Amino acid sequence: MGLASYGNYQKDLQKKLDKFISFDSETGEFEVNPRLRYIGDHSYGSRFTDEFVEIFGKPREDESALESRYADLAFALQYRLENIVCTLAQWLNKQTGSRNFCLAGGVAMNCVLNGRLAGKEFVDNIYIQPAASDN
């Protein structure tokens, strides 16, 4: 998510992204809308459905200019990710009473997210399992 630091908050983009990744803070459940990732036509490659492209725009072609909209989308994704993970951690804290967290996987390598989580009043310790992939 290194590109996120070059982006800006865009309210309309954030609203679109909220529909892409839903989160219920009462149950701790989240879902990536499968219609935007898996279900539907894939005219732009295997990663993007046509519906995703309709909402967020065409993916960047190799060697093409890096437009600000890509950085803004990365910013919006980072923002959404941080909010979901921090809210989920708070939900887990309320469910278990634990103030210690263990993270693993590619998302756990996101140092901006980890810094934000570490600053939460309900967090005492975070262990991040270091052997993860980022694919």
Where are these regions (language model features)?
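Short acidic/glycine-rich loops and adjacent helix/strand connectors
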Residues: 1-135
